Amino acid sequence: MLKRLKSFLFKMVLILLIAPIVLVGVVKYVDPPIWGWKLSRIVAPPKNYPDSSQHEWVSLTRISKNMQLAVIATEDQKFPHHYGVDFESLFDVISEAGDHGPSRGASTITQQAAKNVFLFPSHSYVRKAYELYFALLMELMWSKERILEVYLNVVEFGPGIYGAEAAAQNYFGVSAKQLSKWQAARLAVVLPNPYRIKVYPQSDYTARRTRWAMNQMSNLGSVQL
């Protein structure tokens, strides 16, 4: 009985380690038609979630450099240089965490992409550990350009509005390629919580954050991956 249990546990661990490698390998080349975050919204839609979502996948070359710089400036300024995990910020989060897991993310763009594509919303340590594993695999197997492309195509900018192209068209009536510095900053600042922080109507908080984002973009200067 014990031998069979050990064999079962070994196989489960093997599956949990190998399956992410396969998934990350596939998404390196294939744009996912559905992903974990979007699926969770469909299964358990939050308040004000629309009956149909908006999304159009575009390559990174069809997304404004302003938009690329805006998310790096606001979400993860170390993105061009780290290997998927900002361990300093991560240890800070763990030290502040309670009994039920971390209350805030401190996630890199790579971790956010991993969470959005491959996993489901949760604050548990198990999910966070799996997120780190996916993120490290993505950094190992993908280019920085692919990570940023996937992130900018799956992130939710508002209820049911996924990706930079859908957000640009919905909020500004332009393509993602045409986003100005101000428009890109305005979109980027809602990403911590697009259900609480909205592109429109503009609040005083959103206006302040947009100005802050534009200053950060100016300080960084350009996107160099």
Swiss-Prot record:
Q: Which UniProt keywords apply?
A: Cell inner membrane, Cell membrane, Cell shape, Cell wall biogenesis/degradation, Glycosyltransferase, Membrane, Peptidoglycan synthesis, Transferase, Transmembrane, Transmembrane helix
According to its UniProt entry, the protein's GO biological process terms are: cell wall organization; peptidoglycan biosynthetic process; regulation of cell shape
Q: Where is the signal peptide?
A: none
HAMAP family, per the entry: PGT_MtgA
List the catalysed reactions: [GlcNAc-(1->4)-Mur2Ac(oyl-L-Ala-gamma-D-Glu-L-Lys-D-Ala-D-Ala)](n)-di-trans,octa-cis-undecaprenyl diphosphate + beta-D-GlcNAc-(1->4)-Mur2Ac(oyl-L-Ala-gamma-D-Glu-L-Lys-D-Ala-D-Ala)-di-trans,octa-cis-undecaprenyl diphosphate = [GlcNAc-(1->4)-Mur2Ac(oyl-L-Ala-gamma-D-Glu-L-Lys-D-Ala-D-Ala)](n+1)-di-trans,octa-cis-undecaprenyl diphosphate + di-trans,octa-cis-undecaprenyl diphosphate + H(+)
The family assignment reads: Belongs to the glycosyltransferase 51 family.
* Native source species: Vibrio parahaemolyticus serotype O3:K6 (strain RIMD 2210633)
Q: Please give the function described in this protein's UniProt entry.
A: Peptidoglycan polymerase that catalyzes glycan chain elongation from lipid-linked precursors.
Which GO molecular function annotation, any one, does this entry have? pentosyltransferase activity
Topology with respect to the bilayer: Single-pass membrane protein
Cysteine pairings via disulfide bonds: none
Keyword Protein biosynthesis on this protein? no
Q: What class of enzyme is it?
A: transferase
InterPro entries named among the record's database cross-references: Glyco_trans_51, Lysozyme-like_dom_sf, PBP_transglycosylase, Pep_trsgly
Name any one Pfam family assigned in the record.
Transgly
The organism's lineage is:
Bacteria, Pseudomonadati, Pseudomonadota, Gammaproteobacteria, Vibrionales
Q: What EC number(s) has UniProt assigned to this enzyme?
A: 2.4.99.28
Question: What protein am I looking at?
Answer: Biosynthetic peptidoglycan transglycosylase
Subcellular localization? Cell inner membrane
